[in-house]
């Protein structure tokens, strides 16, 4: 917990205002099971990351989700062949 004092002037007199920021350690768990700690102001102890670099199909080409992208490439090539001369 960090605590700092800040002086500010209000109606011609100085006052002391305390500004308190509480930080918590948070564990972020990636899709592949790896985790790391981050200091944050969110009081949640952990976050399960749904989308990260370990489960995105473009970053991890071994994932089966790329089959739909390959299917779109073949559809696009058929479309380009059909309307090539226009």
Curated annotation (Swiss-Prot):
Keywords: Mitochondrion, Ribonucleoprotein, Ribosomal protein, Transit peptide
GO BP field: mitochondrial translation
Lineage: superkingdom: Eukaryota
Protein location: Mitochondrion
This protein's record includes keyword Ribonucleoprotein: yes
Stored InterPro entries: Ribosomal_bL31m
Alphabetized GO MF terms: structural constituent of ribosome
Transit peptide residues according to the UniProt entry: 1-18
GO cellular component: mitochondrial large ribosomal subunit
UniProt keyword Cytoplasm, yes or no: no
Induction comment from the UniProt entry of this chain: Differentially expressed during meiosis.
Family under the similarity heading: Belongs to the bacterial ribosomal protein bL31 family. Highly divergent.
Described function: Component of the mitochondrial ribosome (mitoribosome), a dedicated translation machinery responsible for the synthesis of mitochondrial genome-encoded proteins, including at least some of the essential transmembrane subunits of the mitochondrial respiratory chain. The mitoribosomes are attached to the mitochondrial inner membrane and translation products are cotranslationally integrated into the membrane.
Subunit text: Component of the mitochondrial large ribosomal subunit (mt-LSU). Mature yeast 74S mitochondrial ribosomes consist of a small (37S) and a large (54S) subunit. The 37S small subunit contains a 15S ribosomal RNA (15S mt-rRNA) and at least 32 different proteins. The 54S large subunit contains a 21S rRNA (21S mt-rRNA) and at least 45 different proteins.
Protein's UniProt name: Large ribosomal subunit protein bL31m
Taxonomic path: Eukaryota, Fungi, Dikarya, Ascomycota, Taphrinomycotina
Name of the gene encoding the protein in the UniProt record: tam9
């Amino acid at each position: 917990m960090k605590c700092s004092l800040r002086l500010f002037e209000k109606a011609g007199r100085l006052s002391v205002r305390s500004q308190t920021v509480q930080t918590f350690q948070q564990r972020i768990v990636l899709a592949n099971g790896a985790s790391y700690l981050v200091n944050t102001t969110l009081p949640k102890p952990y976050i399960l990351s749904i989308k990260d670099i370990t489960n995105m199909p473009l970053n991890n080409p071994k994932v089966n989700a790329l089959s739909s992208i390959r299917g779109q490439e073949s559809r696009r090539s058929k479309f380009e062949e059909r309307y090539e001369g226009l």
